[in-house]
Amino acid sequence: MSKIGINGFGRIGRLVLRAAIDKGANVVAVNDPFIDVNYMVYLFKFDSTHGRFKGTVAAEGGFLVVNGQKITVFSERDPANINWASAGAEYIVESTGVFTTIDKASTHLKGGAKKVIISAPSADAPMFVCGVNLDAYKPDMKVVSNASCTTNCLAPLAKVINDNFEIVEGLMTTVHATTATQKTVDGPSGKLWRDGRGAAQNIIPASTGAAKAVGKVIPALNGKLTGMAFRVPTPNVSVVDLTVRLGKGASYDEIKAKVQEAANGPLKGILGYTDEEVVSTDFLSDTHSSVFDAKAGISLNDKFVKLISWYDNEFGYSNRVIDLIKYMQSKD
């Protein structure tokens, strides 16, 4: 397994490291100019959402040592100055949220990185969603995007529905947990005024490109889906509401059967299925991209349905980052 570096040790960076440990992937370096190694230990050890790290973590001689393994720590602001090669890091997770274009993310290559995986949507980098379009990956691609957590939830479900019943058109709403870009109390927020309102006090309508991005990973759905978000005052776990018009009529039971078939088959581990009386906290630290809620969906008639799917927007997504890297490594 090739060695991994992480740029940006925030929510996703830290959880990618947790996911890497769970999956036996080898992280050898972390870069973050705003956090020293002792602070990294603290932030990695204690997590208000996912709980304490169950292994050991310490700082020794400038290294971050997790479960006895030394991880090199850099503190460079400019990705071009990170000497990834000195740590042997070849696949870089770009999780700052800042360097999200091919031009900006490819500066990592100057320090010896071979590939860069952006943990966010990208305006120009090829986007991949595990279980949906990994076969489009080519070894000559240097910079790729793992899309967004919401696209990772929506795309596998949309694929199953479109493959079996044909999506004519659809609208998506994600009821989305709070993220780090929001404000604890009302504050300025550039052009998106509503986004600046207190996260703990409000349900905030917001934009999302997640549904349109599905058209990039499933070309047959290009122009057929769009969506919006409601930001809600919960710390983690979000839920997608996909309302679609179908080309081929189907009962809700037939739809459930096809989703369950995919969840137990080709999309196992990516798409989950539940028929229990679940609520959002039941999905904390769930590793699926998407868990279909059979009891929450509704059907108006055989061609117009509302489908519901849950996702841990932090940890499910972080697991897919590692899965994408593992897939790339198998092809490179």
From Swiss-Prot:
UniProt pathway: Carbohydrate degradation; glycolysis; pyruvate from D-glyceraldehyde 3-phosphate: step 1/5
Record-listed D-glyceraldehyde 3-phosphate binding positions: S148, C149, T150, T179, T208, G209, R231
Catalytic activity field: D-glyceraldehyde 3-phosphate + phosphate + NAD(+) = (2R)-3-phospho-glyceroyl phosphate + NADH + H(+)
Keywords from the named record: Cytoplasm, Glycolysis, NAD, Oxidoreductase, Phosphoprotein
Phosphotyrosine: modified positions: Y273
Active site (record annotation): C149 (nucleophile)
One example of a Gene Ontology biological process annotation: glycolytic process
KW Magnesium (keyword) present: no
Sites bearing Phosphothreonine, chain numbering: T274
Top class in the EC scheme: oxidoreductase
Listed result of changing A80V: In strain: MA2
Oligomer and partners: Homotetramer.
Pfam families listed in its UniProt record: Gp_dh_C (PF02800), Gp_dh_N (PF00044)
Family (UniProt): Belongs to the glyceraldehyde-3-phosphate dehydrogenase family.
Sites annotated Activates thiol group during catalysis: H176
UniProt GO MF annotations: glyceraldehyde-3-phosphate dehydrogenase (NAD+) (phosphorylating) activity; NAD binding; NADP binding; peptidyl-cysteine S-nitrosylase activity
GO CC terms in record: cytosol; mitochondrion
Positions that bind NAD(+): R11, I12, D32, R77, N313
EC number from the UniProt entry: 1.2.1.12
UniProt-listed CDD domains: GAPDH_I_C, GAPDH_I_N
Subcellular location: Cytoplasm
Protein name: Glyceraldehyde-3-phosphate dehydrogenase 2
InterPro entries registered for this protein in UniProt: GlycerAld/Erythrose_P_DH, GlycerAld_3-P_DH_AS, GlycerAld_3-P_DH_cat, GlycerAld_3-P_DH_NAD(P)-bd, Glyceraldehyde-3-P_DH_1, NAD(P)-bd_dom_sf
Encoding gene (name): Gapdh2
Organism expressing this protein natively: Drosophila melanogaster
